Amino acid sequence: MPVACNVVTHGMRVTGVDSSPSLIALCRERLPDQEWIVADMRGFRHARTFDGIVAWDSYFHLGPDDQRSMFEVFAAHARHHTILMLNTGPAFGEAVGNYRGDPVYHASLDSNEYRGLLARYDFELIEHSIEDPQAGGRTVWLARGR
């Protein structure tokens, strides 16, 4: 939600996707003029492409195979110069963390594999920052569609 608020504050439109109906309901309440869709991002298909695609604090909750498959989803919704921004873990692995007392799954691929997926799906890497302190310690990927 904070990412969407920031985008809207800068005069842009948001199409938000989440598998949680209650989270989408909250988004519709707080930002009613935007498009909110209840869907699993792994199977998301929209009739149009976007100027920007952001998978922030969501993508790394997918398993390694689903993360690989998501690049097809990203590419299907990108066009020339679409910006793709996502965050991952710093290295290959899987872990179960804790958020407010609930277990939370995290997974990441190896940095070289992410680089390969970006290239394979025609994204040019602009910036990669591992455990970026300005992003709360997140590992950030910023790319552009070619």
Which ranges hold each PLM region?
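Class I SAM-dependent methyltransferase SAM/SAH-binding core
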Residues: 1-43
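A conserved beta-strand element that flanks and buttresses the S-adenosyl-L-methionine
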Residues: 54-55
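A short His-aromatic
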Residues: 61-62
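A short glycine-rich, Lys/Arg-flanked "PGG" loop and its adjoining helix->strand segment in the class I
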Residues: 68-80
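Conserved beta-strand signature within the Rossmann-like core of class I S-adenosyl-L-methionine
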Residues: 81-88
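Short "lid" loop at the C-terminus of a central beta-strand within the Rossmann-like core
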Residues: 89-94, 131-133
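Acceptor-substrate binding/catalytic loop of class I
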Residues: 96-113
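Core SAM-dependent methyltransferase catalytic element
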Residues: 129-146
